[in-house]
Amino acid sequence: MIFWLMPIIVAVFWAGMNSLAQYQSAQNAPPTTQTAAQSQAASFVGYRNAVGSYVAANPAFTGSVPTSSLAPWLAPGQSLPNGAGNQVAATPSGDGRIIYSWAQTFPLQGANPGVTNAAAQLTGGDASIGLVAGTQWVSPIYGVQALTVPAFVPDGDILSVVQTGS
């Protein structure tokens, strides 16, 4: 009489073990593209903020801020994004600065708008962040902008353009 319960017990046991195996494999899965995009976005935003802090502390500076000069403004242990670069130019009046900060969106081929979207989300919709598409700057919030991207910024990179002063 108890023998008719045995197949049910085995089936329930097998289903439970299968569910447990699937759960564990999901917990040990490698980072997804979304997680990688968020990580790259956080790295870029930290870099961009460090460049801006350097310029705020050195308002007459123009040129490219050396990586070694950014250490006081980077979070402890923060790594720089791949292909990170910056350029600080004087505004036409000379009273302000235009700060360009950029980085590769992925070490793979092609641009990844996921990094740009994640950076915009991380900064609460900061309109200074966009993606370089040829000579155009594309905001994840506002689309194609009238800003012509300088030739020194590589195509496909994430780009932040901030003006200080006038």
Segments from the language model and where they lie:
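N-terminal signal-anchor/signal peptide hydrophobic helix marking the start
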Residues: 1-12
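Alpha-helical structural elements
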Residues: 9, 68, 95-97, 132, ...
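Generic detector of short, locally flexible boundary/turn motifs and exposed helical patches
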Residues: 10-14, 29, 55, 60-64
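Aliphatic-rich helix starts adjacent to a transmembrane/signal segment
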Residues: 12-42
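N-terminal alpha-helical signal peptides/signal-anchor transmembrane segments
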Residues: 37-61
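Extracellular/periplasmic head regions of type IV pilus-like filament subunits
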Residues: 56-123
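Short, surface-exposed interaction loops/tails
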Residues: 106-166
